[in-house]
Amino acid sequence: MANITLSTQHYRIHRSDVEPVKEKTTDKDVFAKSITAVRNSFISLSTSLSDRFSLHLQTDIPTTHFHRGSASEGRAVLTSKTVKDFMLQKLNSLDIKGNASKDPAYARQTCEAMLSAVYSNNKDHCCKLLISKGVSITPFLKEIGEAAQNAGLPGEIKNGVFTPGGAGANPFVVPLIAAASIKYPHMFINHNQQVSFKAYAEKIVMKEVTPLFNKGTMPTPQQFQLTIENIANKYLQNAS
């Protein structure tokens, strides 16, 4: 993986006769910069990735979606499949497997980001269920924190509870949704469509990233999610 020197190059302008930069920033470049930044600030990975990806999209994605004609004609050619194909194309352009095969650190950071997202999503869901049952969430948080620590996630312990440093939104799903919503904004007005596209993005990201876990010691996202669900079910059953 290339050394991260893009920021220095973009701002090092000392002469008035500097020619315009010809190199075009790609989705792969943006992703590589964001995932490498995890080494210094893993907790901000998903946010920074989404911001940079969206910034790139604003300057790179064509704003024209349909040729001029009747409104019904434009809508007829835009389907859910069109949006999903676009997200798949964006995911492929990131070349996650290719980058991971060249850089072990990149591969591990990718796995850490995925497991941290699984931790965050399932923690929030399970905590809501426990609270609705009148069950204290502190023992649950402590136990899933231990599970996250045993899985090899970096983080810190506060008040006896371990929390992964990168807990938050999935750093791979967010850019795909952002890209598609910018290119096809009208397809994201309906809530059911939003849910459908998010589920599809999660599905293709999971399929793309899961093979990376087979080469390491960390549990797969599916295994880690099952661990958290089993812990939650134990507390829910005790509350019944």
UniProtKB/Swiss-Prot annotation:
SUPFAM superfamilies named in the record: SopE-like GEF domain
Primary site of residence: secreted
This protein's UniProt keywords: GTPase activation, Guanine-nucleotide releasing factor, Secreted, Virulence
Chain spans, region GEF catalytic domain: 78-240
Any one GO BP annotation for this protein: actin cytoskeleton organization
Gene3D superfamilies named among the record's database cross-references: SopE-like, GEF domain (1.10.4120.10)
Keyword Secreted set for record: yes
Keyword Secreted: yes
GO molecular function terms attached to this record: GTPase activator activity; guanyl-nucleotide exchange factor activity
Family matches, as InterPro entries: SopE, SopE-like_GEF_dom_sf, SopE_GEF_dom, SopE_N_dom
Subcellular location: Secreted
Family in the record: Belongs to the GEF (guanine exchange factor) SopE family.
NCBIfam families with a match to the protein in the record: PRK15280.1
Protein name: Guanine nucleotide exchange factor sopE2
Gene: sopE2
